[in-house]
Amino acid sequence: MALLQWMLDHVQDEEKNCENLSIDDQHSLFGINRDWLSFLQLSKLEITHLKHVYKLVDNDRAHLMVHPSSDNVHAWSFLCKPDNVKVVILGQDPYPDGRGCGLAFGTVKECSIPESLKNIFKELERSVPNFSPPDNGCLNSWCSEGVLLLNSIFTVVHGLPMSHEAFGWQTLSYKIISKLSVEMDSLVFLLWGNHARKLSYLIDARKHLVLESAHPSPKVKSARMPFIGCNHFVRANLFLTEHGKDPINWNILNE
């Protein structure tokens, strides 16, 4: 009990010292779209924690190559607004080779397509009528359909996967997931791989559809929940239409 009381007092003391920032101030500081900041309603403590994360990232940028660029870290927030979200695809962290663009699994157009994304296209080609794999990994047009492509860790050092796992980005990503779960209705969450599946506790499965499978990476072999054959894209659209929402046009990547 004494430890619990100390922790509560410590949090309260820390909150008292936290800065109360307006949405515009948060936008300037974090580079996150204002609509998302208004939706999230970050607490003073969360803002303080995020400022610490940004300091750690900036320290690394001073002497290391960090992906994606500062301008693209929160591209997800500008390409898919909270009111438009219908499907959430959870990723881990950006590609450590510089192909990432601020969207989970997506790349900039000029880069080659990563193996995980090739497998995603393979599952789409297998299950979605008339889907043809595009010649690049840009997934921006999915965002306009209401697909939120969200990594749980937003930055990475070149060549070092998960290098920023301990920085505290989860303060933001977990808040996004839990807030969407609470505030929105009838969303589809696609959790691919152990890292994403561990976040299922943040989602209310009574009101949302949660689909899980192995990670799409060809390096992952899972007899119990293989990615190829999961039918997640078809099942997502069935759920959306059953709940009065327009299905995702997965084929828009080629339009």
UniProtKB/Swiss-Prot annotation:
GO cellular component: host cell nucleus
One GO MF term attached to the UniProt entry: uracil DNA N-glycosylase activity
SMART domains: UDG (SM00986), UreE_C (SM00987)
Extent of the signal sequence: none
Keyword terms of this UniProt record: DNA damage, DNA repair, Host nucleus, Hydrolase
EC class (word): hydrolase
Name of the molecule in the record: Uracil-DNA glycosylase
